[in-house]
Amino acid sequence: MLFFVLLHIEGVSAKLRKLPYLIFNRIYMAIKDKIKKLADKYTKTLHSQIAQRKKEMKDDTSHYLIYRVLGISNEEGQLIDEYQNTGRFLYKYAGSFLEEATTLCFTEVYPEGCKTKIPNTLGQKPKTFEIDFLNGTDAIEIKWRDATTDGDHITKEHTRVKVITGAGFTPIRVMFYYPQRAQAIKIQETLETLYSGVNGEYYAGDYAWEFVKRYTGIDLKQVLEEIAYERTASNND
């Protein structure tokens, strides 16, 4: 069981330092419980989608002919298809879960903050830009991972950041896992420079986890590790 003494969290906001220990501990336990329930919801949906997709794949194996031409047996082809489709669903739901769990941490500690759309004052497409969590002047974007290799992504993000700063907000990008492909990494490096150029903030990898901990007082990574350990231990019983 984790208990946080706010005065011992380096860099934690002044607002959080003023919270009595028992009140903050109650907030922490409430967040952990909500994240557990959120994980239950995503787990159920994920496994349901995977089961449905496997059923659909059994009804369409005609393309195995091409696999066999390329030296892949029917059995190998089936496993490859299953893992590929399972991976797609897992990636999708893992990302959505982490982003929603992060938002839970923010909203529980800063209930006045919320998801917000602001008009695009620099163009017609898109008409609006969404801010994942707007708290005061902090415009926080939450990404579990951004693996895009599309150069247009930089142009769109540049416009988005300029619109946000023009509205009087500070753009803050939080991305927990860095992409692996060279082109995607290059794009992230460009985005980091972009945020720095407008006095915004860019956090990726370990820095993203630390930012959430400093901003909310909640060690989200530790919460997730606790839940993962509890579920792994339960599955091994």
Q: Model-derived features: where do they sit?
A:
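Active-site metal-binding core of divalent-cation-utilizing nuclease and nuclease-like domains
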Residues: 115-134
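Catalytic cores of nucleic-acid endonucleases
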Residues: 144-197
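Short, Lys/Arg-enriched N-terminal segments with co-localized hydrophobic residues
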Residues: 4-28
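Domain-level recognition of nuclease-like catalytic cores that cleave nucleotide substrates
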Residues: 176-237
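Interdomain/boundary linker segments immediately adjacent to catalytic/signaling cores
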Residues: 22-110
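Short glycine/proline-enriched coil/turn segments at helix->beta-strand junctions
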Residues: 111, 135-138, 167
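Conserved catalytic cores of phosphodiester-cleaving nucleases, focusing on short active-site segments
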Residues: 106, 131-144
